[in-house]
Amino acid sequence: MTVLIHVLGSDIPHHNHTVLRFFNDTLAATSEHAREFMVAGEDNGFTESCPALSLRFYGSKKVLAQAVIAKAKANRRQRFFFHGQFNTSLWLALLSGGIKPAQFYWHIWGADLYEVSHGLKFRLFYPLRRIAQGRVGGVFATRGDLSYFARQHPGVRGELLYFPTRMDPSLNAMAKERQRAGKLTILVGNSGDRSNQHIAALRAVYQQFGDTVNVVVPMGYPANNQAYIDEVRQAGLALFSAENLQILSEKMEFDAYLALLRQCDLGYFIFARQQGIGTLCLLIQADIPCVLNRDNPFWQDMAEQHLPVLFTTDDLNEQVVREAQRQLASVDKSGITFFSPNYLQPWHNALRIAAGEAE
């Protein structure tokens, strides 16, 4: 039997760390198909912190792709599970036959599916990537992403799977300890990445609420982002008074981030694709409703779980927000499919499917 190999094909430290810790702590003990990893980037202590995993690190995306292709060609029974697929060379290998469809299983993360960049390089590559995506052996994704993908590639197998957000189920009832009243606090975006469209989001919040709310913008990740942070701060101060605007430019530890989220009354996410599920989960867990772009297909996942969804096109005010909070508080969080531990069983299924052990 050939053991499944997992591929983290791009150096995305935060997400890669989450995946590796999840596999080490939760999956590796029960499945031999959850232990082998090829990772783009430096070790950064992963080998030491994930002793249950066999990790190989590669200095660049290109070097990793060459190693994957070599393994694929050497043994056509070898299967790979790609966690997010932002590696151009691997898509091209799937197109050229270097990697066969039956060897290629892909967990969609979001930006690896949607065609939102306007750069010339991306616009030229997207059509090729789209063809390659239709050749994968199978995809794993959120309900909304599966729906989006199936419209383009109806013949490719798709299975429901959620990114393993770090969650403590014991916190599901914690939100009820806080009485919500007074000035609203609104979280804008889930990180400092430009895909959050912070400036457009700040303008949208201002248009809805004026300078009557506290606005919190977490921008501590990614690193080396000061110029963009300054740009967002300048735009924010043109709309909101200094006491109502909080731009967080330092990276936060998880517990501090959790505490920050629980001080908020509303999350505001303007991006037109699925991203930031981790932050959405933590907000929902705390009975904090989220405003989504109607083009973000994750609203389908939320509606399927009978969660209230607010849209950027809705007329929003404090009364609407408080009602959404009330509705969220009435939901039994233990039954939400994309919460821990409910997302675990689909991961076990995904491993068997990708390894060729399940129909």
Curated annotation (Swiss-Prot):
Task: List this protein's GO terms for biological process.
Answer: enterobacterial common antigen biosynthetic process; fucosylation
Q: Does the keyword Iron apply?
A: no
Q: Which UniProt keywords apply?
A: Cell inner membrane, Cell membrane, Glycosyltransferase, Membrane, Transferase
Gene Ontology cellular-component terms listed: plasma membrane
The membrane topology noted for this protein in its Swiss-Prot or TrEMBL record is:
Peripheral membrane protein
Has keyword Phosphoprotein?
A: no
From the UniProt record, give the pathway where this protein acts.
Answer: Bacterial outer membrane biogenesis; enterobacterial common antigen biosynthesis
InterPro entries in alphabetical order: WecF (IPR009993)
Q: What class of enzyme is it?
A: transferase
Q: What is its EC number?
A: 2.4.1.325
Write out the GO MF terms: 4-acetamido-4,6-dideoxy-D-galactose transferase activity; fucosyltransferase activity
Which chemical reaction does it catalyze?
beta-D-ManNAcA-(1->4)-alpha-D-GlcNAc-di-trans,octa-cis-undecaprenyl diphosphate + dTDP-4-acetamido-4,6-dideoxy-alpha-D-galactose = alpha-D-FucNAc4-(1->4)-beta-D-ManNAcA-(1->4)-D-GlcNAc-undecaprenyl diphosphate + dTDP + H(+)
Subcellular location, record wording: Cell inner membrane
The similarity comment for this entry is: Belongs to the glycosyltransferase 56 family.
Functional note: Catalyzes the synthesis of Und-PP-GlcNAc-ManNAcA-Fuc4NAc (Lipid III), the third lipid-linked intermediate involved in ECA synthesis.
Q: What is this protein called?
A: TDP-N-acetylfucosamine:lipid II N-acetylfucosaminyltransferase
Q: What is the lineage of its organism?
A: Bacteria, Pseudomonadati, Pseudomonadota, Gammaproteobacteria, Enterobacterales
